[in-house]
């Protein structure tokens, strides 16, 4: 698997690895271990493959929830950070296991103009998924979203913001 991940991947390669790991926890664990590889291409490609797992196989990553959060908080490479945020967005966030450090990270990235749009959008959605349990936290999220009024937003950021506002409004009905 490492050899395959050491080259530029096409979608057929990704699907082949997904099929290879389908229902095989040992191979998923090996693929996950490759996300730590020193070779940047291998680790990034391994994360990219995980983003293509179907929902059934994606559940295997639920046990890696806190590990993914820990890694996102310190990751320097934007591509890997974006891929890990994508993986976290596909996981449930339970009220009893929220992490304030990750909430703070997400709020900080929402308003950081220096961050890529994809990371800001993912952080917006992840912040909502964590903060929706508490009205006072939702108010903090609304304030962060209001701060975005001061800048010209990309269509993707506008859409993510609108989705959160609409979702929050529907929850109150």
Regions picked out by a protein language model, each given a short descriptive name:
Residues 1-173:
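Alpha-helical scaffold domains
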